[in-house]
């Protein structure tokens, strides 16, 4: 263990001891009277979509993409009944009153204790933490807020606000399973920031709620800032945490602390794209799912940085474009991505799709962001996530791009050990990926012992997996 890691772990242990002692006192104290509110104007001005265009968006979507509204309403109606799709379990019913500590699949309730006192690796008493974590990412809330934004139906806004308020009430700072993982906190913060954007016109978005949600967002980002996933096979965990710090710090900019979050997030994102993305643009863990996961986080940060004139290191854009080139080539003729390595079933941004069985929305956004006609060809259509990330003008840019078939039917990724061949770029063509790489990251990560295997897709179906 290097000296730097020893110092980091000793410092973390000291912080935990202080926080554990302070936690009981903190729970008894009232919230500070000067808790920050949402600076609605500045938040909206920095968001992905500008205040000038947001008012016209619902009518534009109704005229241009009415199917998006129909889908949003159908899902929002189910969410108002506390029914949602969760991982591979299908629809789960959260009950009349949502208990954010109860596993929605097994019904087992996780105990309330200091956040660092859970042993998720060795103690299986309460089951798999993945399901409770997935629920508490609250990635369904932006889709509920989106339905309100597109329809003006107030009950969707009220439901989203009620769920956030109930989460805050049930999860005091530092207590419970939902404070255990900095990555899960980071994804929840990103979900809340999108939800806030969609709900800003709602009468239910009161000053009292604004203060409460900002207290919680600040506490959660403060936690991520204190306890990033360093020296623990972090990889995509650290990328996700850095994205939340950067996005949250940039959107809420106004204090020394928010600028600290922004700058730390930016430094980590720049560092980790060099550490984790190989020379050929493939993520080091050699998992197609986690590759898309990392690309999705970087796209969120890169687009918001461009929107706000934040000067990222130039290698960020180049590496993200490389990552999308891998996605373009590895995507099969049916639009799906072969499942190489682990897949946890989650997603970094879930405004539309909830998994990475395909990542055509990333290619759609990449076509607009980088002016890539071949990305447009493979994305097949303008995707909803591109609209929310890049705004209405992205529709015009995408439409003006020619859809140009990629130049080659073969692409080698030698650093990763992937060799992709295809007979063409139509839906009936054959597509094969040879895996000649290693296990992935030095600690194994999400790679599999699958060297010299291959996946074959032909005639519209899997032949070898």
What are these regions (language model features)?
Residues 110-122, 126-321, 325-337, 344:
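Aromatic-lined, polymer-binding surfaces characteristic
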Residues 5, 17, 21, 25-28, ...:
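Short secondary-structure junctions and interdomain/linker hinges
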Residues 104, 139-142, 423-425, 438:
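Short, flexible loop/turn elements at secondary-structure junctions
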């Amino acid at each position: 263990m290097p000296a730097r890691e020893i110092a980091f772990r000793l410092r973390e242990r000291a912080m935990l001891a202080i926080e554990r002692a302070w936690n009981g006192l903190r729970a008894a104290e009232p919230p500070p009277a000067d808790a920050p509110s949402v600076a609605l104007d500045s938040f909206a001005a920095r968001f992905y979509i500008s205040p000038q265009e947001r008012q016209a968006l619902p009518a534009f979507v109704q005229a241009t993409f009415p199917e998006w509204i129909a889908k949003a309403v159908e899902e929002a109606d189910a969410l108002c009944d506390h029914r949602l799709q969760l991982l591979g379990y299908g629809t789960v019913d959260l009950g009349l009153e949502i208990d954010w500590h109860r596993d929605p699949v097994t019904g087992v309730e996780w105990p309330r204790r200091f956040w660092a006192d859970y042993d998720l690796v060795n103690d299986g008493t309460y089951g798999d933490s993945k399901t409770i974590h997935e629920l508490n990412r609250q990635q369904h809330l932006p889709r509920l807020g989106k339905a309100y934004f597109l329809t003006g139906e107030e009950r969707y806004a009220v439901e989203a606000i009620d769920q956030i308020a109930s989460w805050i009430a049930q999860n005091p700072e530092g207590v419970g399973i939902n404070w255990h993982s900095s990555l899960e906190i980071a994804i929840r913060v990103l979900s809340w920031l999108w939800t806030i954007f969609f709900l800003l016109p709602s009468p239910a978005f009161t000053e009292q709620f604004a203060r409460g949600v900002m207290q919680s967002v600040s506490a959660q980002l403060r936690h991520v800032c204190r306890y990033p996933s360093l020296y623990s096979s972090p990889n995509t965990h650290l990328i996700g945490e850095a994205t939340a710090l950067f996005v949250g710090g940039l959107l809420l900019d106004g204090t020394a602390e928010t600028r600290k979050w922004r700058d730390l997030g930016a430094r980590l994102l720049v560092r980790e794209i060099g550490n984790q993305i190989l020379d050929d643009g493939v993520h080091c863990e050699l998992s197609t799912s986690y590759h898309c996961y990392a690309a999705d986080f970087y796209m969120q940060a890169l687009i918001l940085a461009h929107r706000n004139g934040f000067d990222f290191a130039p290698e960020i854009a180049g590496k993200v474009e490389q990552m999308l080139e891998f996605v373009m080539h590895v995507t099969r003729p049916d639009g799906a991505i072969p499942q190489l390595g682990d897949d946890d079933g989650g997603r970094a941004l879930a405004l539309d799709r909830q998994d990475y069985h395909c990542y055509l929305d990333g290619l759609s956004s990449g076509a607009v962001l980088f002016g890539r006609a071949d990305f447009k060809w493979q994305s097949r259509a303008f995707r909803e996530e591109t609209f929310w990330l890049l705004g209405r003008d992205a529709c015009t840019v995408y439409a003006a791009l020619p859809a140009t078939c990629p130049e080659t039917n073969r692409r080698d990724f030698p650093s990763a050990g992937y060799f992709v061949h295809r007979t063409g770029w139509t839906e009936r063509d054959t597509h094969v990926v040879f895996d000649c790489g290693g296990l992935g990251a030095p600690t194994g990560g999400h790679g599999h012992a699958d060297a010299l295997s291959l996946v074959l897709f032909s005639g519209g179906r899997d032949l070898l997996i």
